[in-house]
């Protein structure tokens, strides 16, 4: 913390360090469809969400059985980027895989 002296009015002003709140977080949710192969979903989870084979398989099975699963939790911009990357990657390979983001 630093102090400055205003010599004209003899006032000491103490500067407080700025406190910023953490950004709101969003979960990226992978949605089930009837066409995207399970192996492709596992690959997407590994490539874009950094999941190991075991975690990627577990999440893929949750998507398959429950219709959806959380892939990760990120600040809004990063969540939106992950969704765009997955969508572009899936479309380029002719798969209808979809992700959405939801506030935590």
From Swiss-Prot:
The disulfides recorded in the entry are none
The GO annotation for biological process reads: protein catabolic process; proteolysis
Give the domain of life.
Answer: Bacteria
For this protein, the record's InterPro entries field holds: ClpS (IPR022935), ClpS_core (IPR003769), Ribosomal_bL12_C/ClpS-like (IPR014719)
Which proteins does it associate with, and in what oligomeric form? Binds to the N-terminal domain of the chaperone ClpA.
Family membership noted in the UniProt record: Belongs to the ClpS family.
Q: What does this protein do?
A: Involved in the modulation of the specificity of the ClpAP-mediated ATP-dependent protein degradation.
Protein name in the entry: ATP-dependent Clp protease adapter protein ClpS
Q: Which organism is it from?
A: Bordetella pertussis (strain Tohama I / ATCC BAA-589 / NCTC 13251)
Organism placement in taxonomy:
Bacteria, Pseudomonadati, Pseudomonadota, Betaproteobacteria, Burkholderiales
């Amino acid at each position: 913390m630093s102090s400055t002296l205003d010599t004209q009015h003899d006032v000491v002003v103490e500067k407080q360090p700025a406190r910023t709140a953490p950004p709101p977080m969003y979960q990226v949710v992978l949605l089930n469809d009837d066409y995207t192969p399970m192996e492709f979903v596992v690959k997407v989870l590994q490539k874009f969400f950094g999941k190991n084979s075991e975690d990627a398989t577990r999440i893929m099975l949750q998507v398959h059985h429950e219709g959806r699963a959380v892939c990760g939790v990120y600040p809004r911009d990063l969540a939106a980027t992950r969704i765009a990357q997955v969508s572009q990657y899936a479309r380029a390979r002719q798969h209808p895989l979809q992700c959405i983001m939801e506030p935590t």
